[in-house]
């Protein structure tokens, strides 16, 4: 029996993510939690004739923790798209304070009710919210770094799509699986186009085209916000990306081997390759790298990729590391308040 809980299931990302998860044959039970509108989402999804059982959980009021506890109880995988999107006039700090509090509250619920679950964090800013979840679980004595994932998959999805769009006659987006390292916002996002099968195409681009491509991957979210006239952000593509990582983890749990995905993880020495990775990223506690997945989560960090990157990518990495340090510290200090 595999139970998946989605926290923030009625939101812009939560709804399509819940739909995709409902269709996964590896899922037996789907628990949908949100503070608004979730009974309707649950009723709607429950009519789909896939085999997973769907249940929605709505707290009676702000103080009610029983709904969250029931949603989480017995969950094997928890996905967190909860939070508020940035509204006009809202600073990044405003957004951070709201989402950080939401994520911390949910992490406390996980610690109490499903401490062994795999936890996938989508709520932005991921560079800070993942450290908050780590600190919260650690404070409760139930932290396993191999089971905590910051979802950066949208950066990989965009990196694959955007290079393919420059070579429409020769390639399809599915031809690529670009490794994207660093973090999950702006200049902390470093796509490694110089490696693997993207190299032959990337190398023939002009310097200007290369810069534009990197910038597009780093700031692709802005394109969607503009196209939606400020009325929303990247929700469908984000739901797909979050689902892709969840699907990979569920496949690994079911015994599929050789699954590698990039994720923003805690470079804890208990994970194979993490200590070596730290040395290459100025001793950062968290960083996004390709990892090998197994039945118990992350089995190995594929750090060697950082020794193979181009000089241009090394420069991008330096900028990313500097910003990441601040983002991580911000999350840690919030959690320790």
Curated annotation (Swiss-Prot):
Q: Name one Pfam family in it.
A: Ldh_1_N
| Xref: InterPro entries | L-lactate/malate_DH, Lactate/malate_DH_C, Lactate/malate_DH_N, Lactate_DH/Glyco_Ohase_4_C, Malate_DH_AS, Malate_DH_type1, NAD(P)-bd_dom_sf
Q: Which positions are annotated as binding substrate?
A: 86, 92, 124, 158
Family matches, as Gene3D superfamilies: Lactate dehydrogenase/glycoside hydrolase, family 4, C-terminal (3.90.110.10), NAD(P)-binding Rossmann-like Domain (3.40.50.720)
- Catalytic reactions on record: (S)-malate + NAD(+) = oxaloacetate + NADH + H(+)
Q: Which domain of life is it from?
A: Eukaryota
Enumerate the UniProt keywords alphabetically.
Answer: Cytoplasm, NAD, Oxidoreductase, Tricarboxylic acid cycle
Name the NCBIfam families for this protein.
Answer: MDH_euk_gproteo
Which additional comment does the entry carry?
Answer: Has antigenic properties. Elicits a specific immune response in systemic candidiasis human patients undergoing malignant hematological disorders.
Protein name (Swiss-Prot/TrEMBL): Malate dehydrogenase, cytoplasmic
Q: Which organism is it from?
A: Candida albicans (strain SC5314 / ATCC MYA-2876)
